[in-house]
Swiss-Prot record:
Belongs to the Lgt family. One of its GO terms (molecular function) is phosphatidylglycerol-prolipoprotein diacylglyceryl transferase activity. The lineage of its organism: Bacteria, Pseudomonadati, Thermodesulfobacteriota, Desulfovibrionia, Desulfovibrionales. It comes from the Bacteria. This is Phosphatidylglycerol--prolipoprotein diacylglyceryl transferase. It comes from Nitratidesulfovibrio vulgaris (strain DP4). Signal peptide: none annotated.
Amino acid sequence: MLTFPRIDPVAITLGPLQFRWYGLMYLFGFLSGWWLGRRRAAQPGSRWTGEMVDDMVTYVILGVVLGGRIGYILFYDLAYYLSNPTQIFSIWNGGMSFHGGLLGVVFAMWLLGRRNGLGFMDVSDFVAPLIPPGLFFGRIGNFINGELWGKHTTLPWGMVFPDGGPFPRHPSQLYECALEGVILFLALWVFSSRKRPTGHVSGLFALLYGVFRFTVEFVREPDVQLGYLAFGWLTMGQVLCLPLIMLGLWLLRPGGDKGTKAA
């Protein structure tokens, strides 16, 4: 059994101001996406400029924060927030939905494409490889908060989480860090380094993320307010991943978009 590192969720205190690790992880995620986007925009043949990447990050931040929070409220705990509306704005305590954030980013990419005369899939293919670092840092934030832990386990790397009872649990946040953060990033970055048919980079992102998240959900404790939705094992996270997997397969289908462009 591994010892859970008890890290103060407050990273920096400046007088009355407190900066939490959870919020800093989002900052690190946005900065990494900005840096990677700038690097890719500077490559020969890119249709993107540094200024477009700057605009993209602004749009994405709004999409992630607003979409992620609204998605969590609607998908996971609507009754609680209807009873406690003042908690809607307490995002520093956690409570963000990837799927809601993704919908927010999709809308942001549509707006960005319209502004710059780019097709939606052109924007999506450029942005997709920049997302996994944000997922990596986000799951680190979940781990520091001691939230979203997994089911009980006897495996040697099981951990006793502060609010997870006396028995070791899967550190499912770290599983997602590795799969959705590291492996997904490497796969997308390498895949998109060559010219691909329009939509294929986005399709690979949707497919791999959906498969990785669907798999980890089997060892992740379901949200207590929802539990299992069906069959004694199906979670809300898995339900929300099914459309992503199907979308990814459709975008990657043989004979799809014939246009070949650099991401």
